[in-house]
Regions:
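Juxtamembrane/disordered regions of integral membrane proteins
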Residues: 1-163
Length: 163
């Protein structure tokens, strides 16, 4: 993997994490956003980059590494965006979508919050590396099925003109 590909992966992961983090305080949507951040962020970023021709997965090793990078970066940006929004909402309008989590964000020391975010980031990297691995096999399965359905073109040797 070259630096350009890794930079694209990180940028799109940051964008996805911030979007998920900003939408997470909405009631009933927050749980779905957390599930997307924990499990589905690697397939989303990988499929987008593959369709945009910015990423080419050649081995399972690259898919696992890509999934781990996506998972960790999405979790860090998700956590920063979510903690910032919840701190602002809790201080200004006394809103809390999850009382225990909001209390922890507001009252805990920064180092403890950082350790918690990194711990969850490693968990998110692990689950997303597995989902990236599964995505690699699903993409290859679809490619193989597509190639089998296409008729094999014979060379133009079989083509003859009749008068």
């Amino acid at each position: 993997m070259d630096k350009f590909v890794v930079k694209n992966i990180i940028v799109f992961s940051l964008i996805l994490g911030v979007i998920l983090g900003l939408m997470a305080p909405i009631p009933y949507i927050g749980t779905f956003m957390l599930i997307v951040a924990l499990i589905l962020s690697a397939p989303l970023v990988m499929i987008y980059l593959i369709m945009d021709n910015r990423l080419e997965l050649t081995t399972t090793k690259y898919s696992i590494i890509t999934g781990a990078i996506v998972g960790f970066v999405v979790n860090i940006s998700f956590s920063i965006a979510y903690a910032s929004v919840m701190a602002i909402l809790a201080k200004t309008i006394n809103y809390s979508s999850n009382f225990i989590l909001t209390t922890m964000i507001i009252n805990s020391p920064i180092w403890l919050l950082g350790v918690f975010i990194i711990f969850i980031g490693v968990l998110c990297a692990t689950t997303n590396s597995f989902s990236g691995f599964v995505t690699y096999y699903i993409i290859n399965f679809i490619r193989d099925m597509y190639e089998r359905q296409l008729p094999k073109n014979k060379e133009d040797d079989d083509f003859t003109l009749q008068k």
